[in-house]
Amino acid sequence: MNIEIEKRIGKNIRDLRERAGFTQDYLATKLQLGGCDITRSAVAKIEVGQRHLYPDEIILIKEILNVSYDQIFSIE
């Protein structure tokens, strides 16, 4: 995937997480409880486009943050 797109998606996730009032630790914990092997550090890397997202992580992030895929993948 294009690095600029990954950075934009990461920024979207960070913005949506902050809007929900969640910390990176909280999001990582919720993802772990949902079955994803992820740490706070990995969440931080996702948010700056330094780590790829796996499909199961995307699905859970959408559910945890209560947002749409359009909000996560918007590149405008």
Ranges and model annotations:
Residues 11-32:
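Short basic helix-loop element that most often maps to the first helix and adjoining turn
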Residues 32-52:
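Recognition helix of helix-turn-helix/homeodomain-like DNA-binding domains
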Residues 13, 24, 40, 55-58:
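Helix-turn-helix DNA-binding elements, focusing on the entry/boundary residues of the two helices
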Residues 1-8, 74-75:
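A detector for short, charged/polar N-terminal pre-domain segments
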Residues 13, 27-28, 43-46, 72:
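Conserved hydrophobic/aromatic packing and binding residues within compact polymer-binding modules
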